[in-house]
UniProtKB/Swiss-Prot annotation:
Name of this protein: Desulfoferrodoxin
Extra facts: The SOR reaction is believed to be advantageous to anaerobic bacteria, in comparison to SOD (superoxide dismutase), because SOR produces no oxygen by reducing superoxide.
General function of this protein: Catalyzes the reduction of superoxide to hydrogen peroxide, using electrons from NADH and NADH:rubredoxin oxidoreductase (NROR) and rubredoxin (Rd) as electron transport intermediaries between NADH and Dfx. Is a key factor in the superoxide reductase dependent part of a pathway for detoxification of reactive oxygen species (ROS) in C.acetobutylicum, an obligate anaerobic bacterium.
Cofactor notes: Binds 1 Fe(2+) ion per subunit. In contrast to some other SORs, does not bind a second iron ion.
Cofactor(s) recorded in Swiss-Prot or TrEMBL: Cu(2+)
The keyword DNA-binding belongs to this UniProt entry's keyword annotation: no
GO biological process, one term: removal of superoxide radicals
InterPro entries to which the protein is assigned, alphabetical: Desulfoferrodoxin_Fe-bd_dom (IPR002742), Desulfoferrodoxin_Fe-bd_dom_sf (IPR036073), Desulfoferrodoxin_SOR (IPR051233)
Family affiliation: Belongs to the desulfoferrodoxin family.
Induction and repression of expression: Up-regulated after exposure to oxygen stress (at both transcript and protein levels). Repressed by PerR.
Pfam families, sorted: Desulfoferrodox
Gene3D superfamilies in the record: SOR catalytic domain
Length: 125
């Protein structure tokens, strides 16, 4: 398994789907086609979306943005995902939480963060 994710979003409903395995058919939400989103790796807006990774031995601490991302009901990080080899681990967030996650026994991989307004962001470990 590589560290790429296939995530599709409905532009009207905001529904996001992580595709683990597909057969080549188009994904839809109701009658609306879903669009595959591509993760951004750089952010001109004061680095508020790119996951910031700190290694502590074989553990990592992830915070979203070198300047902490806001967490309000209108604008927040919905989840952070670690992809490392055959491992996929998710931290689901709510607006009352900090945009942070910890993952254990990690030596390499990619971390993804999804902002409800500004889409998908990633950083390699």
């Amino acid at each position: 398994m590589n560290n790429d994710l296939s995530i599709y979003v409905s532009k009207n409903s905001g529904t996001a789907v992580l595709l683990l395995q597909g057969n080549g058919t188009d994904l839809t939400c109701g009658s609306e086609p879903m669009a595959k989103i591509v993760a951004n790796t750089t952010d001109a807006a004061q680095e508020k979306h790119v996951p910031h990774i700190t290694k502590n031995g074989n553990n990592i601490d992830v915070s979203v943005g070198s300047v902490e991302h806001p967490m309000t009901p209108e604008h927040f990080i919905e989840w952070i995902i670690l992809v490392s080899g055959d491992r996929l681990e998710m931290a689901k967030l709510t607006p009352d939480m900090k945009p942070r996650a910890q993952f254990h026994n990690v030596t390499s991989g990619t971390v993804y963060a999804y902002c409800n307004l500004h889409s998908l962001w990633k950083a390699d470990i």
